[in-house]
Structure formats: C-alpha cells, structure tokens
Swiss-Prot record:
It catalyses: L-glutamyl-tRNA(Gln) + L-glutamine + ATP + H2O = L-glutaminyl-tRNA(Gln) + L-glutamate + ADP + phosphate + H(+). One of its GO terms (cellular component) is glutamyl-tRNA(Gln) amidotransferase complex. Its EC number is 6.3.5.7. It comes from the Bacteria. GO terms for biological process: translation. PROSITE patterns: AMIDASES. Allows the formation of correctly charged Gln-tRNA(Gln) through the transamidation of misacylated Glu-tRNA(Gln) in organisms which lack glutaminyl-tRNA synthetase. The reaction takes place in the presence of glutamine and ATP through an activated gamma-phospho-Glu-tRNA(Gln). InterPro entries: Amidase, Amidase_CS, Amidase_dom, AS_sf, GatA. Keywords: ATP-binding, Ligase, Nucleotide-binding, Protein biosynthesis. Belongs to the amidase family. GatA subfamily. This is Glutamyl-tRNA(Gln) amidotransferase subunit A.
Amino acid sequence: MITLKQALSLSQDELETLKNEIDAKVRASDLNAYIKAPSLNGASAKGVPILIKDNISVKGWEITCSSKILEGYVAPYHASAIENLHQNGMAGFGLSNMDEFAMGSTTESSCYGITKNPRDKNIVPGGSSGGSAAAVAGGLTVAALGSDTGGSIRQPASYCGCVGLKPTYGRVSRYGVIAYRSSFDQIRPITQNVEDASILFDAISGYDSKDSTSANLKPTHTFINLIRDKRFKIAILRDHINDASNEVQLAYENTIKALKEMGHEVVEKKMLDSHYQISIYYIISMAEASSNLARFDGVRYGRRAQNVKDLKELYLKSRSEGFGDEVKRRIMLGNFVLSSGYYDAYYLKAQQMRLMIKEQYNKIFEEVDLIFTPVAPTTAYLFNYHASPLEMYLSDIYTIGANLSGLPALSLPVAKDPLGLPIGMQFIAKAFDEQSLLDVSYALEQELDLKLD
C-alpha cells in the first residue's frame, strides 16, 4: 500500500483511483477489518483516504462503537480530529471494526464479528483498535485513526506489525469520541511507518475550545523536525519484563543492544510493580465506563427495546439486549467500586495510587529522556485463548502506565518470533515531548531497516 507521505502528493484523480482500489480490496478481504465497504458511506471530504475507528464521530455516518445498542445512531457532527483531517488534505474513508465500546484487547467482542490478523488469520489482531491495525498491516488502508485508552493503539500495532502513536493526554481533542473512559480516551494514529505517524499526528493535534481537557499549546510540527542522529538517555525497566515470553525478552535485549550501538545512553530504573498498575487502571476505567454508558438506555438514540410495559422495563430490556457480555461485566464492576460502601476502599484509593504512578514517572524523567519497554508480554495469540477476562486484562500490563500518567508513547515493530509474528517495543516520553518519541523511533526504524511486509 502507498504510504501517507506518498499519497499526499497524489492528484484528485489519482486519489479517486486509490479509493476505488481500497474499496475493491476491502470487498475481497476476509479480515473483517472494516465494518462495511467504505464506498457505502463514501468519503467524508476530498483528500487522502484514512480509515476511522467506529467510535469517532463522522457527520452523516452510522457510528455504533461495534455495539448493538447504538444501531441506527447517525453522528450529527464531525469529531474535531475529522475536521483537522479535512484541513490537512485527508478524509475519513471507511469505519474499522473494534471491541465493543473499546472494551477488549482482541477485537473479539464486536457485534460485527471478529477481525483476523493479516499475519496469521488464526490469531487475534489485538484490540480494541484491532480493525484499524489489521487494515494498515493488511494493505487495506493508507493509515488509520483509532483510540488508545489502555493500550488500544499500541498493542494491536505490536500484534499486527505497524506503528502506533499515543500522544500526550490533551494533545489531540477528544471532542466527537464516544466516551468510554473520559480521563483516558484519546484519538491516535496507526500507520505503516514512523514518518506517516508523525504526519498524521501533526494533522490531528492542536488546541480545541470544544474539549475542556485540550491543552492550549501551539500546533505540532514533528514531521519537518524529524532528526535521525539525536542521542538520548533511555531508561529500561528490566524488572518489568519478568512476565514476558522468552521471544519478547530476547527482542527487548537485542533492541537495547542496538540502541547502545546507535550511541544512546541506556540506564536501568525501577518502578511500582506493573501488576498494581493493572488493578488501578481497571478500577478507575470501569468506574468511568459505568458512568459514561448510563446514557445508553433506549430513550434518546440507538437501540430501543420493543413490547415493554413501562419505562423501567424499557431501560432494562434495551440495555440487556444491546450490551455484550464484556460491557455488562465492566458496568457492573464500575457500579460496585462507586457504591457507597466501597468507594473509599477501591475508587478513591486507586485515584491516590494513580497520582503515585505519575510521580514515579516524573521522578525517572528528571534523569532520562525516554523509557523503553515491551508493548505486550507475548506475541499475538489464538482466538478464544484466554480462559478468563483477567488473563485478557494482563495483556495490557506494559501499556497502561502511560495511560494512567497521560504520557506519550509509541509502539514500533522491532522483530519477529519463530512463527513470523511481529514483536513491538515502545518508547515513553515526557508529557508533550512527542518529538523525542518520533525522533528515536524514526532512527531505530532506519537502523533496523524495518519494513511493513
């Protein structure tokens, strides 16, 4: 597939040809990366076609978060990120499959069915932005937008072998994203390479008065400022990788060696056990989810249950029929930790620990420029692999720290396991220092001669 950098130089006629080629590929593909053929909605404007995750509002498109409860909901406005695409020569073209309401790490919980990994169709593409990552890796789109709440960009990018960038919380407007976890949610790019990630990030970032969490900063210009030969002081967290597979640990050590050979200074640091971060993250995120999803009740928009006697039955039946099992599980757990008897014991304590994690990152960044860790403890696994939801939650063990702290992070494919499955590593940077993330990743990508094949 043509890269985003190349596509931006195409004429309007050439772009129409490209859209037709993408549409034909999607119709012929069995990956189920798209919810439906992109030509059925058409493009949101003229420009380079970008795949959009099904939780980002595009005016006139049915946006469902891959959930039955939002069947028939048509977005009445563009998300700010979509408007920014239009201003930078790009446009939405197609909606990607995802875990229902972004609650999952495998893209198995979508009401539209599973998405397959183009590297091996028997394994998961990751999630929740699995459709976006599978489409990029499978040559079905130039680039894609997803959302990263606890690793939902970086983990599927790692599993599928592409680049996933999570900007600093507040750098990209959340306006127009259907809320799951408001203190975590943000729109992010998934691309074929680091240059494209930089271009797409510059296009969608910027202050937005419609989003109260938007940082009032100048627009970014990371692409024109990409530098290959800059040297950084990088922290590694060896005590964090004990849960990783042998293949991931080997790739981690080999990449550390490559970074040293490139002239970067590598030092060891320690942090709070990542298992604690998992607990903290899920307590807070489930609490926020139960609050945000209370609005979906069958009254104003989306699925409305039929043959009900009263308002209470309408609520119960609409939500029971509309939500999938994983969403129901998280709503119930969220309501539990917010209940009067358990608020202090769980939710309040988790928020206090979240501040402690932020302080730990800040302390490390007083001495280093970047932190380097694996993205996931294993490569992608078979469908229906996890015996329990808890096992699935543990696949986020290395990614959630950046989300809890609101820090920028980038997933880069660095190796393959013996079965040929991609292995991704991530860099984490100081708040609003996406430039350093992109610089070091761009240089490493060139050093390892990484190509999306």
